[in-house]
């Protein structure tokens, strides 16, 4: 199954084609044609064959529809209700997820939803603080991937690289002893709920004063409305997230990222599996 890309750090977009809609339409069209042939067109060809004493050839479109419908239907069900693959094309979730990672997103962790339309069919669970989640931002049809930081009703404050939730500072410690190959990265670890999240900021030098500064991204204070979530990228200084475009409504949830199953940055590279892991 082809993997969709998610979350370009500057624009946080992936692709203009609505693949679930295309897949649903293709499945419906081939299914209707296959059903019509079973109920009516096939019988008519059989009558014509007996009348003219020769076999009437099955039209190409019917032949192809009957061949593709079972495959399309299976893919549609799996991608809609079980799991869906995505590709990470940027660094807004570094250091945990890097450009070229292929991830598997569970479609049932937060309940079963109507394909394309997003209406909840069966409620199973709710997002937890620290989950890595795929979703649609408000008023944007493109897929994003971020970490759940704020739950409905939470008071969120982010200043001087310190995250505070409901008046309590989130435990943060620098990752000492971890090799940092890129000199502009500042790494730390946050404890969000039951998750330990590795995060990073951009370290730069002020051209006017030559002083070292760490760009931690937009700061502010927010109250999460009911039925919404506050999302942040792990790469705090290079992520367009709820700090800039607001809260994610529950109906926009796509699924929970559960595993990295391959790394393949470009067509000229060889796919690797050394980053494969389950995500906490």
Locate predicted features:
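Soluble "head" domains of membrane/secretory-pathway proteins
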Residues: 2-44, 53-57, 61, 86-87, ...
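Internal/C-terminal transmembrane anchor helices
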Residues: 52-83
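Short surface loop/edge beta-strand patches of beta-sandwich-type extracellular domains
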Residues: 91
């Amino acid at each position: 199954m082809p993997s969709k890309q998610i979350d370009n750090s500057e624009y946080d977009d992936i692709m203009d084609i609505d693949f679930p809609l295309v897949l649903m339409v293709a499945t419906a069209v081939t299914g209707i044609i296959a059903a019509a042939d079973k109920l009516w067109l096939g019988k008519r060809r059989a009558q014509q064959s007996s009348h003219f004493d020769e076999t009437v050839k099955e039209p190409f479109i019917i032949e192809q529809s009957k061949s593709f419908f079972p495959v399309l239907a299976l893919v549609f069900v799996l991608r809609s209700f079980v799991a869906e693959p995505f590709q990470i094309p940027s660094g807004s979730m570094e250091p945990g997820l890097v450009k070229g990672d292929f991830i598997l997103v569970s479609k049932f962790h937060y309940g079963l939803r109507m394909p394309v339309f997003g209406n909840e069919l069966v409620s199973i669970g709710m997002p937890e603080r620290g989950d890595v989640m795929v979703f649609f931002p408000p008023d944007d049809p493109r897929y994003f991937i971020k970490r759940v930081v704020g739950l409905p009703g939470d008071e969120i404050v982010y200043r001087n690289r310190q995250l505070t939730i409901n008046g309590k500072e989130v435990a943060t410690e620098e990752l000492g002893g971890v090799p940092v190959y890129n000199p502009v990265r500042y790494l730390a670890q946050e404890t969000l709920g039951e998750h330990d999240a590795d995060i990073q900021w951009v370290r730069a030098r002020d051209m006017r004063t030559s002083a070292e500064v760490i760009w931690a991204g937009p700061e502010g204070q927010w109250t999460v409305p009911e039925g919404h979530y506050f999302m942040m990228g792990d790469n705090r200084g290079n992520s367009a997230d709820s700090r800039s475009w607001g809260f994610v409504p529950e109906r926009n949830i796509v699924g929970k990222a559960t595993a990295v199953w391959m790394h393949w940055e470009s067509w000229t590279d060889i796919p690797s599996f050394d980053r494969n892991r389950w995500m906490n």
